[in-house]
Design a protein with these regions (language model features):
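Amphipathic alpha-helical repeat scaffolds
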Residues: 40, 129-137, 251-256
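Short, aromatic/basic amphipathic alpha-helical patches
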Residues: 66-77, 232
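A glycine-rich helix N-cap at a beta->alpha junction
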Residues: 74-93
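Structured adenosyl-cofactor binding patch, chiefly the S-adenosyl-L-methionine
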Residues: 100-102, 140-144, 153-172, 230-269
C-alpha cells in the first residue's frame, strides 16, 4: 500500500474531493470514468460490500492504522492520500466524514425491468429533488421492507455526496434504477399495483386493508412542494392519504415515505 502525504489543500490529488462539482464527477461525456465520493468508514464499507470499485482514499493521518485500517486492507492496490487535520478541515463538511473519504467509480445503471422481477414492494420517486430527502427515503426503504427504489430522471442523484451520507450507505444496500416515460405501464405489465401518495377526495387511507393485501405494490411519492403530477395520479390504481391530526394535511416527503413504508413494506422477520 502506497501512502501519499498531502500538506497543501490545493494539491491536485484533492480535486476530486474538494473542487469537482457533482456534475463534473458524474462526467456524462465519459461515463466509464464517472465517480462519486463516499464518506465515513461505515458508508465506505457498505459501498465496498456492494461491489463499488475504489479509486483513491483520503483520510486523516491517524486513521491509517486506526479505524481506516480494515478498509485499506481490503484495497491494497488503491492510492491513499493522508493529511493532518489542519489541512483536511479546509474541506467543506469534513467534520461530517468521520475522517475518511473514498472516491469510487459509479456502478453501471440497472434495468428496472430486471430489478423488479423478484420484488414485491417498491418505492417510486417522481422528481424528488433534495439530496437530503432522497438519502432519508433510501434509509427508510432499507429499514422498512422495500425491495427497490425507482426514480425518474429529473430528480436528485442517489450517489450525490449528501444523499449517500444521509442514507448512511443504504443507497448501496437497496437496489435502484431510473425509470423512463411510461413507467406506470411497465409496473402494471410486471404485475404491480400502484399507490399514489396524494391528497385527493377519492383517496383511501394508508391503513386500507386492500393495500397491504396486494401481492405486488409500488408506493409512488412526489416531488417536494407540488407532489405528484396529475397524470401520474390518474395512471395509478390507488390514491392514498396518511390520516393526520390538528388540521395538518401533509408531511415532508421523507417523513411521509417512512410512514408509508412502515405500513406497506414487507414485515420484518
Amino acid at each position: 500500500m502506497e501512502i501519499h502525504q498531502i500538506t497543501d489543500f490545493n494539491a491536485p490529488e484533492l480535486d476530486v474531493y474538494a473542487r469537482l462539482t457533482e456534475n463534473q464527477l458524474v462526467n456524462r461525456a465519459d461515463p466509464e470514468n464517472a465517480l462519486f465520493v463516499a464518506e465515513s468508514p461505515l458508508v465506505i464499507g457498505r459501498a465496498l460490500d456492494a461491489g463499488c470499485a475504489p479509486v483513491s482514499f483520503l483520510m486523516e493521518q491517524k486513521h491509517i492504522e486506526g479505524k481506516g485500517a480494515a478498509l485499506l486492507a481490503r484495497c491494497p492496490d488503491v492510492a491513499v492520500y493522508a493529511a493532518e487535520l489542519d489541512v483536511l478541515t479546509q474541506l467543506t463538511g469534513f467534520h461530517l466524514t468521520r475522517g475518511m473519504l473514498c472516491a469510487m467509480r459509479r456502478p453501471k445503471l440497472r434495468d428496472p425491468a430486471v430489478l423488479l422481477q423478484d420484488a414485491s414492494r417498491v418505492a417510486v420517486l417522481e422528481n424528488v429533488m433534495n439530496p437530503t430527502n432522497l438519502g432519508a427515503i433510501f434509509r427508510s426503504a432499507a429499514a422498512l421492507g422495500m425491495d427497490a427504489v425507482l426514480l425518474t430522471s429529473a430528480g436528485s442523484d442517489p450517489l450525490y455526496r449528501r444523499a449517500v451520507r444521509v442514507s448512511m450507505g443504504t443507497v448501496f444496500q437497496v437496489p435502484w434504477a431510473y425509470l423512463s416515460e411510461g413507467w406506470t405501464e411497465l409496473l402494471h405489465t410486471l404485475g404491480f399495483r400502484t399507490a399514489a401518495m396524494a391528497l385527493r377526495d377519492d383517496s383511501v387511507r394508508l391503513d386500507d386493508p386492500r393495500l397491504a393485501a396486494e401481492r405486488k405494490l409500488a408506493v409512488v411519492m412526489g416531488t417536494e412542494g407540488d407532489g405528484l403530477a396529475d397524470a401520474t395520479i390518474a395512471a395509478c390504481d390507488y390514491t392514498v392519504r396518511i390520516p393526520m391530526h390538528h388540521g395538518v394535511d401533509s408531511l415532508n416527503v421523507a417523513a411521509a415515505s417512512a410512514v408509508a413504508f412502515y405500513q406497506l413494506g414487507k414485515p420484518a422477520e
